[in-house]
Amino acid sequence: MCGIAGELAFGAAADVGAVQRMAETLGSRGPDGAGSWSHDAVALAHRRLKIIDLSCAGDQPMTDPELGLTIVFNGCIYNHRELRAELERAGARFFSTSDTEVILRAYDRWGRDCVTHFKGMFAFAVYEHESRRLLLARDRLGVKPLYLADVDGALRFASTLPALLAGGGVDTELDPGALHHYLSWHAVVPAPHTILRGVRKLAPATTLLITEHGERDERCYWEPDFGRQERYAGYTKQDWDDAVLEATRAAVKRRMVADVPVGVLLSGGLDSSLIVALLADSGQQRLATFSIGFDDVGELEGNEFRYSDVIAAEFDTDHHRIHIDTDRMLPALDGAIRAMSEPMVSHDVVAFYLLSQEVSKSLKVVQSGQGADEVFAGYSWYPPLRDAPGSGADAYRMEFFDRVGDEMAQTVADAHLARNDPSREFLERHFAKPGADGPVDRALRLDTEVMLVDDPVKRVDNMTMAWGLEARTPFLDHELVELAGACPPELKLASGGKGVLKDAARGVLPAAVIDRPKGYFPVPALEELEGATLDLIAATMSSDAARTRGLFRPQYVDMLMRAPNDHMTTLGSSKLYQLALLELWLQAHGI
């Protein structure tokens, strides 16, 4: 895992200084090394976190003069050894044992289609010296981020949005359509948009080829099928259980590929516990596991250690309980906001930030259970869609959207209000696409391709990489996602959600863990807006910067402030916190 940045200028020399400033902001993503390369119209920079091939042979930017290619890469190609062997049989010669060089050689052999050969998480840029073209690519599920900005006569890219801001020249006006998404989708802004008009993000499963003249060719190379498929027509329930278990086992095993130790973030829930169980079953001994807990606040419990302790004891892990005192929360909130590439409102952002800080003191790589709820239908909004009329888009909107009807106009000031309903339009377009059989399938596809990418996946990447920690997410293995997409929705909805995953796990996990009530990352100090947290919000919303910006109608903000814990979204999040978080993020990043 690393940080990348670069610029391709059109008809001029690249701004090397801007790229260097961008790279400097990526230091936490790559504390083990820094490198840069430039030639005429192109400049590339890299910050390295050493995970595979710890020698200087794996340093980046990596250039092969014989091939005429230079690459910067963030991520991990889990099948790099298999691909290396295949490429060697075809005559390729390697000077390192890095997965970076495998991408370079694969690109030489297969061109932009090389991405279809990769099993992993990645965002990379390859520059062709002779043609002066630049290829940008992002993995199938968008685990690794890649942000883009058009500046005067050039295209810039970076692993984070703040890195692009550091380069200068970026249009930082807010995008009204993106603001509408932010206030509808729990802060998610679907690709290619971001909250800022001048910054875009490359969509998952996408390659973008840019010529020296600025011409662009963008292609999507993968899209999972959420319909029933002929090859699974004869599957029994037991067949599905077995297939899901084996696909999960393969995904977990793949993510142990590293030249450094790999641990697990263990909440004690089904998903992270299954990762631990499968690793123990494969022979991993004294696996390092980590759980986090906070002070209780009133009746709100601050930890789930009793569940993680069961798994740690069952599989004899080297377990670490990490307790965070309440007085660390507010300073950590500031740090977490500064680490966000885009504003994110989930309270567990702070939990991941603090957990990553502690884990990074002893490890560079962990596996984490994000994604299983979206892939295997673990959330509360899926069951009501079973009998939804039509495409199911209206039912999904009523179950999921933070604001419906006239409330958006009551929230946002006229100058920043979208003149249509872009969030509803996006939802209806997505639900109308072929490749999903019913409303539940359509919702799972949307959540897998959009919500998952720009909420939990982005959250984990941003918070772990703030401390130079690489997080790997086996439930986002594309082969596992393809299998889950084909699985009948009734099997996923069973047993209160994730039914097929629960039944698949019964042979390897204690029933007490599988059948426990669904939990969430508990962060009690932020659940109730009071004390120092409420004071911070009040000061932020009444600040000169907020008043000058004028995003929200004052009477709406005043209403929320009078009863800060009474106004909640459909899924139970604070509407006031959502507004304040955006303003805090904008101020933290100098916007």
Q: Residue ranges of each PLM-predicted region?
A:
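Short low-complexity, flexible loop/linker segments enriched in glycine and/or proline
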Residues: 334-338, 382-384, 528-530
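Cysteine-centered catalytic environments shared across enzyme families
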Residues: 1-340, 352, 503-507, 512, ...
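A mobile, often basic/glycine-rich helix-loop segment
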Residues: 376-401
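Adenosyl-5′-phosphate
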Residues: 1-4, 21, 113, 166, ...
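Conserved S/T- and glycine-rich ATP-binding loop of Class I adenylate-forming
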Residues: 266, 369, 452
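Short acidic/histidine-rich active-site segments
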Residues: 363-373, 377-379
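Acceptor-substrate binding/catalytic loop of class I
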Residues: 344-346
